[in-house]
Curated annotation (Swiss-Prot):
Binds 2 magnesium ions per tetramer. Pfam families: Phe_tRNA-synt_N (PF02912), tRNA-synt_2d (PF01409). One of its GO terms (molecular function) is magnesium ion binding. It comes from Methylobacterium radiotolerans (strain ATCC 27329 / DSM 1819 / JCM 2831 / NBRC 15690 / NCIMB 10815 / 0-1). One of its GO terms (biological process) is phenylalanyl-tRNA aminoacylation. This is Phenylalanine--tRNA ligase alpha subunit. Signal peptide: none annotated. The gene is pheS. Its cofactor is Mg(2+).
Length: 360
């Protein structure tokens, strides 16, 4: 065994025996520092003959590289071991309740909470979430959805139009989230199963209407989607959202340009002492609109109505939030009143889950 082999064996043994980074650094300095054993060998290369340097140079440089590699590897091992030890000693008991400090406590807005509740319900049924821009083209907001040129929704008194562009075309603040249905059908191939929550805009302002409001729509496109499937989806949603064991629903024939046939859906309820309860009583309350996707809409999205079909539905998020949580006026939703939010808002850790009930 040569002197280099002996030195390498000793140095690697010292590296492996280093129990912490301080000890390892001491070994590194003793071997590779300015006055280290390997550094001293490198200095001898200058006094060697060319033949000796050609023979000894690669051996000494190889020794240096192997020692440096061993030091780096050992440093990584020690760092990982130190991290594991620290994590084990600093483990947090996540079962402990969160300490609340009322003076700094924030609240989740009811709209955000209800959107999360709706998302949890439909995710359990296999729906994905789709989103789109608030500013839309006339084509996506109206034409592709089978709105005729003279439809009242295209008038200034019902829709917010932006200034015309260079071509004289005007974009709009979307009046519904339906343009995202068009975008989805054009971008994806069936089967499609999505919900589309988001902001929408219309000229309207009173106790139950605001110029900006929130809506969630659902879209299912498949080869065999039918009204029976639509009815089941809506019943399951209403039971889960209002947290009742059963609901009675009635479908009233209606008209929407983008669905055929179309229906408005009422849900059974009772009104007692100013409180609305669902799943009981002899009264009815309109809750949403729905229908089978119109063949013209499928064609406008590049789909063959003879090969696929589907259904869609739309629910006002603000409205069902008011109904579920007993909020009499829609306008405070958007007034940024911290007192109102402290009363109607939700704690940050009130994450909706179907396991223990949405509001458990």
């Amino acid at each position: 065994m040569t002197d280099l082999d002996t030195l390498e064996r000793d140095l690697l043994a010292q590296v492996g025996a280093a129990s912490d980074e301080a000890a390892l650094d001491a070994v590194r300095v003793a071997a590779l520092g300015k006055k280290g054993s390997v550094s001293d060998l490198l200095k001898t290369l200058g006094s060697m003959t060319p033949e000796e340097r050609k023979e000894r140079g690669p051996l000494i440089n190889g020794l240096r590289d192997r020692v440096q590699g061993a030091v780096t590897a050992r440093k990584t091992e020690l760092a990982e071991a130190a991290l594991e030890a620290r994590l084990a000693s600093e483990r947090v008991d996540v079962t402990l309740p969160v300490r609340e400090a009322p003076e700094v406590r924030g609240r989740i807005h009811p709209i955000s909470q209800v959107i999360d509740e709706i998302t949890a319900i439909f995710a359990d049924m296999g729906f994905a979430v789709a989103e789109g821009p608030d500013i839309e083209t006339d084509e996506l907001n109206f034409t592709a959805l089978n709105f005729p040129p003279g439809h009242p929704a295209r008038e200034m008194h019902d829709t917010f139009f932006l200034a015309p562009d260079r071509d004289g075309k005007r974009k709009v603040l979307r009046t519904h989230t339906s343009p995202v249905q068009v975008r989805t059908m054009r971008a994806q191939t069936p089967p499609i199963r999505v919900i589309i929550p988001g902001r929408t805009y219309r000229h309207d302002s009173d106790q139950t209407h605001t110029p900006m409001f929130h809506q969630v729509e659902g879209l299912v496109i498949d080869t065999s989607a039918n009204i029976a499937n639509l009815k089941w989806v809506l019943e399951e949603f209403c039971k889960a959202f209002f947290e009742v064991d059963g609901v009675k629903m009635r479908f009233r024939p209606s008209f929407f340009p983008f669905t055929e046939p179309s229906a408005e859906v009422d849900i059974q309820c009772s009104r007692k002492g100013g409180e609305i309860r669902f799943g009981e009583g002899d009264d009815w309350l309109e809750i949403l609109g729905c229908g089978m996707v119109h063949p013209n809409v499928l064609r406008n999205c590049g789909l063959d109505p003879d090969a696929v079909q589907g259904f869609a539905f739309g629910v006002g998020i603000d409205r069902i939030a008011m109904l579920k949580y007993g909020m009499p006026d829609l306008r405070p939703f958007f007034e940024a009143d911290v007192r109102w939010l402290d009363h109607y808002g939700f704690r940050p850790l009130d994450v909706p889950s179907l396991v223990g009930g949405l509001t458990a």
